[in-house]
Amino acid sequence: MLQFPPFARANHGPARQHRPTGPHPAANADNNAPGPPGPRARQRPPTPSHNVGRPRPPTPAHARPTIEGPHPYTGGMHDPTLSTMEHRDLVEALALSHVLPHETLPAEECLGRRLAVDLRSLIPLPPFTNSAMDGFALRREDLAGDGPWTLPVVADIPAGDTREHLLQAGQAMRIMTGAPLPEGADTVVKVEHTDHAPGVAQAPDTVQVRVAPKLGANVRVAGEALEAGSPVLTAGRLLDGAALAAAISVGHGTLTVLPRPRVVVVSTGTELKQAGEALERGQIPDSNGILLRGLVEEAGGRVVAHLRTGDTPEELRRALDEAPDADLVITAGGISAGAFEVVRLTLGTDAGFHHVAQQPGGPQGVGSTPVGARGRETPVICLPGNPVSVFTTFHMYVAGALAVMSGLVLPERGATVPSAVIARARVGWESPEGKTQFIPLRFVDEAGACSSAAAGLGGGEAVVPEAGVRWVEPVHPLGSKSHLVASLARAQGIGVVAPERGAVEAGEELAVVALVG
């Protein structure tokens, strides 16, 4: 399995908190100066270094981005171009500087959360020696010789009985499944092997045992399944019903879980309309809002507000000021090179904007901004407005940031930074030279004709998939174009094509971030 450069580098357990320092890789000595006045303008805090957590040789002076004109982080026209690695480092540094504390909750409230620490048994399992069957507890030595054997029944022990019982030689006690084995008993004979009928009935005065069991039969000894102190669950485990049952069964009433970062999602653009509203010329449904809400929840975050604003800085600033407290703001749209880029105009002194050498989703922004009535400084990640760009860049960067902020460091699918599998292209397609391509793909596991979605990509003849090999094809004939939102429902992975490649030929291998099992 190909592992992408990870956000969190610990092996197991909660992530350690790091405080990034240093300037942006493209910044110079004057780059921390405040920009021109704007809505709620103030001096921009230092942008995290792109070298946090990953030693890397210094970039030669001739290879560094050249910045001309106004500083790029105050709305200038000349944004630096970063590699996908450099942008990932900026997002990583932002997340590492805002790692959230663990939460301790009643176990019953932890469904769907992730365990923050390794869990060990507080008690043995079973916690006491008990009967594995409905029947009669006795001493095996009392069944000597040939049967049947008749014994007096001196007590009736239901499940949950807390009384102390002492079994004497030559006696029997009726016992139910799960009930504590009385002191002195070492064997349980099933009710079916006696003259006593199963079911609801009074305990008999005597019992006739017709089949002699082995010594220790139908007895569960305390601790035979699990000793106290034994490991039960590991940190990072998703707490489903089975995991919670295991935790409670070994004595845990509360659990320490990873936090779910609170996220404010912001869709920008006067052209956006609520789902189902009638559309006028130039208007489109706001698909980014529900897309981001779903992606955030799937990645372990919790959306506390979805804001939809127009293209004026005053409107966006007011919406952020009135938003609830959050741990992260994610914006969609308003960061490109147009005349009405509302996010850039509003957050120009708060966030760093740059271009990433990737397709789709070149324009990106990272920083922090005041949110809520108290003006709490909150991390912000700014994404482009095209839905395919939102989809791919969220999976490649933002999902990992949420995992880091929550302290999750285990590389589980859909929960941390992308891991890739190697697959082969069912058909060929073009890839832009000089840019990393993130292309939504579907897996093709059966031989046959090329799907209509992948037809006409211009990569030569389609290849018939071989058994035992994972094959992929684009979900849309136009490949990775950023406006193809309707095709995202078919996406099962994101192909990663290196910038120097230029094209993918049918049958060639490529890395694929799998979004499904």
State each model region's role.
Residues 79-148:
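Intrinsically disordered, low-complexity, positively charged segments
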Residues 85-88, 103, 107-108, 116-117, ...:
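Flexible glycine/proline-rich
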Residues 73, 78-79, 119, 136-310, ...:
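Short, glycine/charged-enriched hinge/interface segments at domain edges or termini
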Residues 68-85, 253-383, 387-393, 411:
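Helix-rich terminal scaffold detector
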Residues 129-131, 143-146, 164-168, 181-183, ...:
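Solvent-exposed alpha-helices and their adjacent loops that cap or buttress functional pockets
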Residues 4-7, 73:
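Aromatic (phenylalanine/tyrosine) cluster motif
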Residues 8-66:
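Compositionally biased, low-complexity flexible segments
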Residues 115, 127-128, 153, 163, ...:
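Short, conserved secondary-structure segments in the cores of folded domains
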